[in-house]
Amino acid sequence: MTIQEMHNEFRTFGQVMGLQLVRGILPESIDVYLNAAINETVRNIISKNVANSLQVGILPQAASITPINALRTLYRVHHTDITESYYFNDNPFELIVDFHNVLLYTDFYIDYKDGKKDVHCRLIEPDRLSDALTDYCTRPTINEPIVTMFTEVAENYLTVIKVMTGQIESDDKKVIDGIKICYIDNPKIVKYNVEGKNEGVDCDLPEYLHEEIVQLAVKKYIASISPTMSQQKN
């Protein structure tokens, strides 16, 4: 649906739910409830996909948000070529990224210069990193590297990605040639297009979710004005 169609659906469904007893709703107010419903829908989808994995601090590949599910229109892939030298556990590869609209990082892959591509990295929370590095079963290896992330205050609160491959100085050195970052964008903030202006912003979630979002927005609106509706009925 376009944003105009979502507004029309909001008013139609609202009348079915009893909103004809309430004075007219401004487009700006409908936008507020639509955006709240969009954000709640996205977070619920993410929660159902990764909640169990995040409880243990590790996000495995099987639990990641993929572009074939409900958030496929928000799925992004960014590839960065690496030209620096070798990296080891005591000097891991670090990359500062400037993605301001990221809702959730889902997957990381690295390429080696010898031709080995798309080696999946395990995402470890920073507070679990020390245990992962010293544990024989979870420590990083060339074929199962580890990625951790944190926000660097000195870098204007940009995200720092740290990659560890378990290599030591005596190893045959494998050079990291590139890194692929997969993430979910925040959804767009929808805005009604006032006649005569070209400021409308449509919902960028898949079409089949739009009706569910509108219905959730109406329910949120009714919940916010339910005392008023009760008074009018009396």
Residue ranges of model-derived segments:
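Glycine-enriched, solvent-exposed interface loops adjoining structured elements
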Residues: 1-234
